[in-house]
C-alpha cells in the first residue's frame, strides 16, 4: 500500500533542522516566516534573549486596509516591506532568514525579496 505523506509533519521536521543551524542575535535577529492559507506573518526574533523585536503581518491594522487578500504574493511583498521599515526604525540592518521549512518560492520568496529591496541585508 501507499503511505500518505503528512505535509505538516514533514515541514515541521525541516523547520527544526533549519532552526538548529541558525540563530538570531540582538545585532542580527532571525526573520521567521509563517504562512497560512489566508495570511502571512513575519517577525524578527532575538534567540539569545528570547524576544520578538519587530513583527508584521497581513492582519495588522496598518496593512489590512491596503490589502484585499492576505494570502497572495502582493500581500507578502507588503509584509516584507513593512517588516524592513519597522526594523530600520529600530536600527536593524542585517538579519538571518528563517524560511520555517517552507520552500523558498512564491509568498516566502516574495516576502524575502521585498525585505531586501527595502534595505535589509541577508
Curated annotation (Swiss-Prot):
Q: Which InterPro entries match?
A: Ribosomal_uL18_bac-type, Ribosomal_uL18_bac/euk
Compositional bias (Basic residues): 1-16
Spell out the subunit comment. Answer: Part of the 50S ribosomal subunit; part of the 5S rRNA/L5/L18/L25 subcomplex. Contacts the 5S and 23S rRNAs.
Keyword Ribonucleoprotein on this protein?
yes
In the UniProt record, which is one GO cellular component term?
cytosolic large ribosomal subunit
Query: Would you kindly state one Gene Ontology biological process term found in this protein's UniProt entry?
Result: translation
A single GO molecular-function term is: 5S rRNA binding
Q: Please give the name of this protein.
A: Large ribosomal subunit protein uL18
Instruction: Tell me which family the UniProt entry assigns to this protein.
Output: Belongs to the universal ribosomal protein uL18 family.
Q: Which organism is it from?
A: Fusobacterium nucleatum subsp. nucleatum (strain ATCC 25586 / DSM 15643 / BCRC 10681 / CIP 101130 / JCM 8532 / KCTC 2640 / LMG 13131 / VPI 4355)
Job of this protein? This is one of the proteins that bind and probably mediate the attachment of the 5S RNA into the large ribosomal subunit, where it forms part of the central protuberance.
Q: Map out region (Disordered) in residue numbers.
A: 1-29
Q: Which domain of life is it from?
A: Bacteria
Q: Which UniProt keywords apply?
A: Ribonucleoprotein, Ribosomal protein, RNA-binding, rRNA-binding
Q: Which HAMAP family match?
A: Ribosomal_uL18_B (MF_01337_B)
Family annotation (Gene3D superfamilies): 3.30.420.100
User: Any keyword Disulfide bond?
Assistant: no
| Transmembrane domains' residue ranges | none
The record's annotation in NCBIfam families points to:
L18_bact (TIGR00060)
Amino acid at each position: 500500500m501507499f503511505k500518505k505523506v503528512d505535509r505538516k509533519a514533514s515541514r515541521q521536521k525541516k523547520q527544526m533542522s533549519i532552526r538548529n543551524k541558525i540563530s538570531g542575535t540582538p545585532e542580527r535577529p532571525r526573520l521567521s516566516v509563517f504562512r497560512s492559507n489566508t495570511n502571512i506573518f513575519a517577525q524578527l526574533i532575538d534567540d539569545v534573549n528570547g524576544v520578538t523585536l519587530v513583527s508584521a503581518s497581513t492582519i495588522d491594522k496598518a496593512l489590512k486596509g491596503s490589502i484585499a487578500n492576505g494570502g497572495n504574493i502582493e500581500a507578502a511583498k507588503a509584509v516584507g516591506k513593512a517588516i524592513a521599515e519597522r526594523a530600520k526604525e529600530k536600527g536593524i540592518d542585517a538579519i538571518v532568514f528563517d524560511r520555517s521549512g517552507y520552500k523558498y518560492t512564491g509568498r516566502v520568496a516574495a516576502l524575502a525579496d521585498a525585505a531586501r529591496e527595502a534595505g535589509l541585508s541577508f
